[in-house]
Amino acid sequence: MTGLFEKYQDKKEFIENRFNELKNRGLNDENLIFSLIEKEIKTNFIVPQKLKSEMYDKVNYMCRRYMDRIARFELDYDFIPDIDALKYALICIFESVPVFHSQFIDNHINPYWKVCDYHVDEILTVIETNDFLTSTDEFLLQGIPVTSNVQFKVALLINGRESKLCFRWNHMLVDGGDYKHFVNDLFKNYNEYVENKTMPLDFRKGSRSYKCVYDDFNESDKKKAKSQFAGVSPHDKHTLPFTEKGEGDNKFIARKSVPSAIFNKARETVKKYDGTVNDLIATAYIGAVYEICNLPEQEKVGISCAVDLRRYIKNINKTGYTNHTTFMPTIVENKGENIFDILKQVVECNKKNKEDKFMGLHGLPLLNIGYSTMVYAQAEIVVGLFYNNANLAISNVGKMDLDALSLSGHKPVGAAVAGAAKKKPCAMMTALTINGNLQLSICSVGNEEDKKILENFFDVLSEKIKELSEY
């Protein structure tokens, strides 16, 4: 500490207080503490006492009426990570992004985040288990109250020489797109520490505002983008045949893996129709809806598909970890004679969506007006009147970057993502690709019969992908 005192003589009190604070939070490597403090001094970074709640924070908070606000992710490894290195990396990213250790204060007028004290053991839990699936669900299906002092929870599950890292976090803070950035940055610092006992500490500290999506437009297009008031929700009323809501309903995750041999062949087929992986997944989902719900062949079906608005941000590192996801409708007019007729309609619909220069930006200005011109309690009621929660929806996180997710040279051997647990009749499916395999999941609130319904839905959906692979 003497070296820091000599270098920053006018910061002695700050250095002493910050050193003790970081030690009390579980950071026991003094050299790393000094590096973190010096970076804060050089960048004039001071941990605030409170932070502004952004528009998407409020939108996701409003959605607590029909979902638990928690997003989930799991990664499988064939070794045991260094627990201290993982703890230190977590502390460093939390210190750099104070909203991660904050409480959401709903004062009904203008909610905000109150930055809190914490210990790393409140973030990371290490669990010995002989049943990965049970332990995973026990951890992932828990909630995180907005009054919690930390908004990310991590579990390291250990079974012999294998391990699983499970993450659950408050969706008000971060969506799946920025979770990938978060975990990539976390692991980058973990790996550097394991190898060299240092960390680059290059975490994103920029704005979390939804308005970042407009920054790289020219002035003319920016004005037009900020005028896209009308929403584009599909307003489709179809639902899967869930049971009625009951007292015995609980949270659960239904999962399905489509093997690479089938998935890759289906991808090649879809390419011949000028389609994408998102088109493939949407086609199989819609085809399964027609079959499970026994819909007439001429019935129109529309689902909502997630759109990552980071497509409009040229340098994502200038922004903070946040939500930049909205939804666009994918609509087919009829079932057609086979799955390929659905595919053609999906590809055509999504091509038209992509021709829109402002795809995904529709409705954002209206949300902003709602939250910026009224006190929060009133805005929540008004926004809730026009905010549409789709019954049928898809969010594809995409292909996992195995190198970025490697720990000490060990690439993950498996991964899965699950969104918030939504109440019936919502069936929000999340997807990712790892090692060529397509991993699907739906997190829901229901009973055992509902879980069987979703598992059957996944079986039918997988058959639709297989049909696409047999072109």
Where are these regions (language model features)?
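Acidic/histidine-rich catalytic neighborhood
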Residues: 299, 303-335
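Short proline/glycine-enriched turn/loop segments at secondary-structure junctions
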Residues: 294, 316, 381-384, 418-419
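Secretion/export-associated helical scaffolds and adjacent low-complexity Pro/Gly/Ser/Thr-rich regions
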Residues: 197-235
